[in-house]
Amino acid sequence: MTGRGKGGKGLGKGGAKRHRKVLRDNIQGITKPAIRRLARRGGVKRISGLIYEETRGVLKVFLENVIRDAVTYTEHAKRKTVTAMDVVYALKRQGRTLYGFGG
């Protein structure tokens, strides 16, 4: 068992999956404890209950912007795979330079 499901190894070989996971609002996957850990890393001691939904909203907007720029770089290079460098350039374009991922 390779853990790849029913798709096989190659690209584009996957047939119809029997139990397709329904994509709900995935932003709820950013759990309350995860947000709490991020806040602790930033030095926060107490957290209001209203913070969690607000944080999810801000994170969603931020990721949408970064991913949109990264996909734009990918499409311009006529590729179908978003690379780490696409994300690095997208972050740099938004004024958030990230070191340690090449380039």
From Swiss-Prot:
Entry PTM: Acetylated on Lys-6 (H4K5ac) and Lys-13 (H4K12ac) during prophase I of meiosis. Phosphorylation of H2A 'Thr-119' is a prerequisite for H4 Lys-6 acetylation but not for H4 Lys-13 acetylation. Acetylated on Lys-6 and Lys-13 by the Ada2a-containing (ATAC) histone acetyltransferase complex.
UniProt biased composition (Gly residues): 1-14
GO molecular function: DNA binding; protein heterodimerization activity; structural constituent of chromatin
Places the protein is found: Nucleus; Chromosome
Region (Disordered): 1-20
Phosphothreonine carried by residues: T81, T83
BP GO terms, sorted: nucleosome assembly
Residue numbers of N6-acetyllysine PTMs: K6, K13
Pfam families registered for this protein in UniProt: CENP-T_C
GO cellular component, one term: nuclear chromosome
PROSITE patterns, A to Z: HISTONE_H4 (PS00047)
InterPro entries cross-referenced by the UniProt entry: CENP-T/H4_C, Histone-fold, Histone_H4, Histone_H4_CS, TAF_TATA-bd_Histone-like_dom
This protein's UniProt keywords: Acetylation, Chromosome, DNA-binding, Methylation, Nucleosome core, Nucleus, Phosphoprotein
N6-succinyllysine modified-residue sites: K32, K78, K80, K92
Domain of life: Eukaryota
DNA-binding region(s) from the entry: 17-21
Modified residues (N6-acetyl-N6-methyllysine): K6, K13
Protein role: Core component of nucleosome. Nucleosomes wrap and compact DNA into chromatin, limiting DNA accessibility to the cellular machineries which require DNA as a template. Histones thereby play a central role in transcription regulation, DNA repair, DNA replication and chromosomal stability. DNA accessibility is regulated via a complex set of post-translational modifications of histones, also called histone code, and nucleosome remodeling.
Quaternary assembly: The nucleosome is a histone octamer containing two molecules each of H2A, H2B, H3 and H4 assembled in one H3-H4 heterotetramer and two H2A-H2B heterodimers. The octamer wraps approximately 147 bp of DNA. Interacts with Nasp; the interaction is probably indirect, mediated by histone H3.
Family (UniProt): Belongs to the histone H4 family.
Protein name: Histone H4
Taxonomic source organism: Drosophila melanogaster (Fruit fly)
